[in-house]
Each structure stands twice: as C-alpha cells, then as structure tokens.
C-alpha cells in the first residue's frame, strides 16, 4: 500500500465523496485490535487503547490523509463500531419507523454532529410543539427547553453556538477501518449516499444565504417529522437532498415514502474507507453476517481550522467539549463561523485535493 492517493483515487474521492483503501492497515495491527476487543471486559471502553488508535496512527492511513487533507491531531480515542447479528425488529428507529420497515437493512442515513434523543417506542400525542418539547425534555439533562445546553443521548448539543445558528458539529474526514469480513451485503456495513457530499455543500451554502442558520431548524430542514408512524422522527438529512436521490428503483416504507438507496461499502479486514464529513451515511443491520460487524471509526479535523484545540478522534462536535462543555477561544476566533465556512466550502480543508478541485470548477457535470 502506498502512502498517498493516486490521481485516479483523488478523482474518485472528489466524485463520490469517499474512497476505499485496500489493505491500508497491516494484518498485525488488525490482529492486535481484534485481540484487544476479544479481551475487553464487559462494559470496558477500549477506544483510547493503543491497539485501537494505532489503526490510524501506525498505519498508512496517516500519511495518506496528510497528503490528501493535511495535518491533524493523531487520534487518542475512537468509536468501537460493533454490531451484533440481528433480525429485523419491531422497535421504532430514530426516523420514527419500525426497524423491520426501514429499507436497505435498516439504514438511517444521517449527517454527523446532530443531536439524537432515543426514539419514543410509543406513538406520540399532542401538537407538534408539544411533541418537540416532550422529546427533547427526555434527554440526559432534562427539560431545558430549546437551548444550546440541551444534550442528546449521543452527547451532542442541540446547537453548537450560543446564538443557536449552528445545529451541526463538523470535522473534515471520516476513517472507517474494517476488522472483519464485510464482502457481502447485509453484514452491518457502513452505507454511504454516494455523491451526496456535493448536494450537502450546496444546501449549506443556500441555508447560509437565507439567514446564516446551518443544519436542522435552519431553512428547509425541520428537526422532527411528525408524519411518521411514531409521530416523532429525526430528520437527519434535508428532505430535498433525500428526495433528489430517489428514483423509480428506490424502496419504500409501508406508508409509500421512497428512501434514497445508499451504497453498502464492502470491505475485508485491513481495508479502510476515507470519506468527507459532508457525505450522508449510516450503519446497517447485520442480518447476513457470520459474526459481529467490527468497524473502528475515527473523525479527523484538519489542524488549520483550530490550531490551538486538540481533536480527540471520536468527537463529531469538536467546537464543544466531548460532553458539551464550552471551550475557550482567543479573541477574534469565532469557532462557529470557521465551521460554517468549512461546511460551505468542503474542499478548503483538503490541501492535497486542490488541483483536482480546480480542474473541476465550472464543470457542473463533475
């Protein structure tokens, strides 16, 4: 495996929003990570263990990202993405539908950095305002109304900034490292909406042009959908983006709603998938696998966005602390404006992609 993307791979990353790197991680590093997972005690969090962080820090992924993206903090922790085998369930998912009714192995395509409150398992009653208030009052910090102090069960704030103009955390790149056989569909793979990073960038630009409010509760993006079976579904990507990726082949839920078909990323142990922050994505149900799905997930931010802030490799809201704490920034440094700039200009933090990007500028079909 080389230490840099080829021109063709960079073209693919530009077009699709992701690239799969075959055998980016050595067998020794994969085995060390698997052994650490196997030896973990019940309830033990092994994200900070060197056997896990070395999947990035001691593999070719680091020089590849340095070349394509730029400098970043070496991850000191990660998300241990283990999905046990399961059959379609009768519980409501975060979109407000029964798990068994959600197409594409239950994929709930979303943007990272968005608050999630556990899905109500009973049909919600009341007006939309009442459903909204009750839903977010059920979060871990209780009833704080509509506020940047509200935290989700995923420990993401409702809003990133005090003025409540930014409701998404952001970073630069994902790295998903595969530790088990995921070469056939339905094994819990990460699913990606190929090419939708372009649509998300344009949508953020449009939101900013309307009223400078980006993310859910900004223009064209409601936070909740009250017309789903449980009357309280998270709207994880803008409806116009979802609809633009639907066609006659798209599968539907029983209410007739079509859903954009994501691509399941088929990988072998040691493969890695690098994506832009901007690409909508999801895990999926491990229905056909012979074992638990094991993906180790890293979130990477180009160091130039906030040189004085260390990013830990797992947070999807690094302008706030991991648990939502307010961070201190020097005078003149508006972190939320910097993040809005990055969300509206997705290639600005990909230093090694600039020749590719410039070659495609002015070409709408790219």
Describe each model-derived feature in a short phrase.
Residues 278-282:
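Short, charged beta-turn/beta-strand-edge "cap" motif at the junction between a beta-strand
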Residues 268-271, 276-277:
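Catalytic cores of PAPS-dependent sulfotransferases
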Residues 3, 19, 23, 319-321:
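Helix-turn-helix-type domain boundary/helix-start signal
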Residues 5-8, 13-16, 25-269, 285-291, ...:
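Non-heme Fe(II) oxygenase catalytic core, chiefly the N-lobe of the double-stranded beta-helix
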């Amino acid at each position: 495996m080389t230490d840099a993307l080829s021109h063709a791979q960079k073209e693919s990353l530009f077009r699709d929003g992701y690239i799969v790197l075959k055998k980016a991680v050595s067998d020794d590093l994969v085995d060390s990570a698997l052994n650490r997972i196997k030896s973990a005690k019940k309830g033990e969090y092994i994200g900070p263990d060197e056997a896990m962080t070395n999947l990035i820090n001691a593999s070719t992924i680091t020089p590849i990202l340095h070349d394509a993206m730029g400098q970043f903090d070496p991850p000191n922790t990660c998300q241990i993405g283990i999905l046990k085998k399961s059959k379609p369930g009768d519980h409501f998912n975060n979109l407000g539908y029964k798990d068994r009714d959600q197409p594409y192995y239950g994929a709930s395509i979303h943007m990272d950095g968005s608050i999630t409150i556990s899905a109500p398992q009973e049909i919600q009653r009341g007006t939309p305002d009442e459903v909204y208030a009750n839903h977010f009052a059920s979060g871990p910090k209780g009833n704080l109304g509509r506020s940047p102090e509200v935290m989700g069960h995923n420990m993401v704030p409702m809003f990133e900034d005090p003025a409540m103009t930014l409701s998404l955390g952001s970073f630069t790149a994902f790295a998903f490292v595969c530790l088990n056989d995921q070469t056939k569909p339905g094994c819990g793979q990460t699913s990606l909406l190929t090419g939708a990073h372009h649509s998300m960038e344009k949508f953020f630009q449009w939101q900013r042009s309307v009223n400078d409010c980006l993310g859910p509760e900004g223009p064209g993006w409601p936070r909740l959908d009250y017309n789903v079976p449980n009357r309280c579904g998270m709207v994880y990507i803008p409806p116009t983006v979802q609809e633009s990726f639907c066609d006659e082949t798209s599968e539907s839920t029983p209410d007739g709603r079509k859903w954009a078909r994501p691509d399941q990323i088929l990988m072998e142990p040691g493969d890695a998938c690098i994506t832009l922050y901007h690409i909508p994505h999801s895990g999926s149900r491990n229905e056909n696998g012979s074992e638990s799905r094991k993906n180790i997930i890293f979130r990477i931010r180009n160091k130039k966005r906030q040189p004085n802030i260390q990013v830990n490799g797992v947070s999807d809201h690094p302008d706030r602390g991991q648990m939502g704490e307010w961070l201190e920034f020097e005078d003149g440094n508006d972190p939320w404006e910097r993040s809005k700039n990055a969300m509206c200009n997705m290639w600005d933090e990909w230093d090694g992609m600039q020749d590719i990007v410039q070659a495609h500028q002015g070409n709408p079909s790219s």
